[in-house]
């Protein structure tokens, strides 16, 4: 989707929480500020700061080394702090996806990026939550959530293809 002067479709800057976290764009509450890998890392660090007894500290003893996997590793280790971080992350991701699905009602939503490497640990609860948030529930058929086969390179390949078609 492309708007006037090739602008628009900046879904990362759709507000999902009014007055929320400050986004890199300067607005508050943007989808990207809650459901990106950067947001997951920020929330993991905050949670670790608040809970010095969390197993996350054993998984990643240095806050500077926290990455998009850290909270999921903690979840798999049974850490309650990590579980809360992942649950919140999935809730925000689901909210944004459901908002878009309620507008466009696609057959499928294809996710990309490093966090998608978490597979079913991410996708199973995300699918359940998204389909619960859809207008009319699954009456109109659930939205299929899947991971891009190009993984973390999907954006790069898409940008290259766009450039080849438009330059």
Task: Give short role names for the model-derived ranges.
Residues 7-16:
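Short, intrinsically disordered, charge-biased short linear motifs at domain edges
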Residues 1-6:
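Hydrophobic alpha-helical segments and helix pairs
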Residues 15-22, 27-167:
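ATP-binding/phosphotransfer module of carbohydrate and carboxylate kinases, centering on a glycine-rich
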């Amino acid at each position: 989707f492309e708007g006037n002067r090739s602008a628009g479709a900046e879904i990362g800057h759709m507000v999902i929480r009014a007055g929320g976290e400050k986004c890199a764009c300067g607005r508050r509450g943007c989808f990207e500020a809650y459901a990106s890998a950067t947001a997951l890392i920020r929330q993991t660090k905050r949670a670790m700061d608040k809970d010095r007894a969390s197993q996350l500290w054993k998984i990643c003893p240095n806050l500077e080394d926290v990455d998009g996997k850290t909270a999921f590793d903690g979840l798999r280790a049974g850490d309650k702090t990590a579980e809360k971080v992942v649950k919140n992350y999935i809730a925000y991701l689901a909210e944004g996806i459901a908002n878009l699905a309620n507008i466009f009602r696609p057959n499928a939503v294809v996710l990309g990026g490093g966090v998608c490497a978490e597979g079913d640990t991410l996708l199973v609860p995300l699918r359940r939550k998204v389909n619960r948030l859809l207008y009319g529930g699954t009456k109109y058929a659930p939205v299929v959530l899947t991971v891009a086969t190009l993984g973390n390179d999907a954006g790069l390949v898409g940008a290259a293809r766009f450039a080849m078609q438009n330059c």
